[in-house]
């Protein structure tokens, strides 16, 4: 079954698919799509549901989103390992919250199978599979965190300069 839209998150996949233009690789390596997606998600006040396995992966995702995008509206989260019974209970839990977007950190291929089996039942318009490395570069540092620190330093410097100018 084909996806409506797939955003490639690894440059190796682009290369294998023969779509490794300089622009596409830059967009992939620098997470440009994700950054823009998050800006629009927050600006349009869209809601997010977190789904994953194991529970600590869901918690890490929650912490990451709260740290990096404090204005994001997370309506609920669900760790698949807590599911007792069939997966319809998970689908119902998601649909009860009526999220606009589901961020998934389910392992592959479990994520693909879950989505294929339940795609028609989910009310969310967007399923965003983040994978394992959504928050870190190769060295384990978040490029988003680094960028945010630079922006905050610049804002702090501007405020201090403004304060000093007002004091004179």
State the predicted function of each range.
Residues 94, 98-108, 124:
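Proline-aspartate-enriched helix->loop->beta-strand connector
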Residues 42-64:
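An alpha-beta-alpha
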Residues 69-81:
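Short beta-strand elements in bilobed, periplasmic/extracellular small-molecule ligand-binding domains
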Residues 1-47:
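Electropositive, gly/pro-rich neighborhoods at or near active sites that engage anionic ligands
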Residues 157-168:
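A charged, well-structured terminal subsegment
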Residues 62, 112-121:
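Short Gly/Thr/Asp-enriched flexible loops that form oxyanion-binding sites at enzyme active sites
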Residues 81-85, 123-156:
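Short, flexible loop segments at boundaries between secondary-structure elements
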Residues 12, 106-110, 133:
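Short glycine-rich anion-binding loops that position phosphate/pyrophosphate groups of nucleotides
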């Amino acid at each position: 079954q084909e996806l409506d839209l797939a955003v490639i998150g690894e440059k190796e996949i682009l290369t294998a698919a023969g779509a490794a233009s300089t622009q596409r690789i830059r967009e992939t390596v620098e997470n440009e799509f994700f950054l823009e997606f998050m800006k629009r998600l927050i600006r349009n006040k869209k809601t997010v549901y977190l789904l994953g396995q194991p529970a600590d992966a869901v918690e890490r995702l929650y912490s990451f989103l709260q740290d990096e995008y404090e204005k994001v509206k997370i309506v609920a989260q669900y760790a698949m390992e807590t599911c007792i019974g069939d997966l319809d209970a998970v689908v119902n839990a998601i649909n009860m919250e009526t999220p606009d977007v589901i961020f998934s950190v389910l392992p592959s291929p479990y994520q693909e199978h879950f989505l294929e089996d339940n795609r028609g039942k989910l009310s969310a318009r967007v399923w965003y599979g983040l994978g394992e490395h959504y928050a870190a570069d190769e060295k384990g540092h978040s490029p988003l965190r680094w960028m945010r620190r630079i922006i905050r330093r610049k804002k702090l410097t501007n405020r201090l300069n403004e304060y000093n100018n007002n004091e004179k």
